[in-house]
């Protein structure tokens, strides 16, 4: 994930679904993905450089790509996305994250990245483990399914 709202959903959707189907699930969070483990994530939609993002009101047809770089566009797009998700009954990232933990999905925060970005364990939610890529790969190497999102 890129640590943005729109990129935060796939790992949690896949993990919660896999756990519900009885799979043992682990998610390794590194670099900007660590944003998803913050107690108070401030995730935003990033319309710039996201060509697959459907734009509201047909904006993709009449609003140039550079227009998404206008100050305030990211905040506006984030507000619109959150509003639409709420109207459609889609769980928030915080809700999905909690559901995964309740379903025994194991979260591993990359210790190297935690150190690199000067995160404190107090910045992150409870119930996570800290480890390196080798810790995750020991699990992934024996898995029938391993996805990189």
Positions of the model-derived regions?
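A glycine-rich helix N-cap at a beta->alpha junction
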Residues: 45-85, 89
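Gly/Ser-rich helix-loop-strand patches that form or flank binding pockets
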Residues: 138-148
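Histidine-anchored nucleotide/phosphate-binding helix
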Residues: 8-22, 27
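Short internal beta-strands
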Residues: 25-31, 108-111
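Short, glycine-rich nucleotide/cofactor-binding loops
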Residues: 1-8, 37-40, 84-88
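N-terminal beta-loop-helix "entrance" segment that forms/cooperates
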Residues: 34-47
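A charged, amphipathic interaction segment
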Residues: 74-135
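Anion (oxyanion) recognition and catalysis
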Residues: 19-20, 101, 140-141
């Amino acid at each position: 994930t890129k640590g943005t709202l729109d990129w935060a959903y796939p790992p949690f959707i896949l993990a919660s679904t896999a756990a519900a189907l009885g799979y043992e699930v682990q998610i390794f969070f590194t670099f900007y993905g660590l944003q998803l483990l913050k107690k108070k994530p401030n995730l935003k939609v990033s319309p710039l450089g996201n060509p697959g993002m459907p734009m509201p009101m047909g904006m993709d047809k009449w609003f140039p790509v550079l227009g998404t770089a206008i100050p305030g566009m990211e905040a506006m797009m984030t507000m619109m996305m959150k509003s639409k998700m709420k109207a459609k009954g889609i769980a928030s990232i915080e809700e999905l994250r909690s559901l995964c933990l309740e379903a025994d999905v194991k979260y591993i925060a990359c210790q190297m990245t935690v150190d690199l970005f000067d995160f404190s364990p107090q910045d992150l939610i409870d119930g996570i483990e800290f480890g390196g890529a080798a810790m995750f790969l020991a699990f992934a190497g024996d898995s029938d399914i391993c996805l990189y999102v």
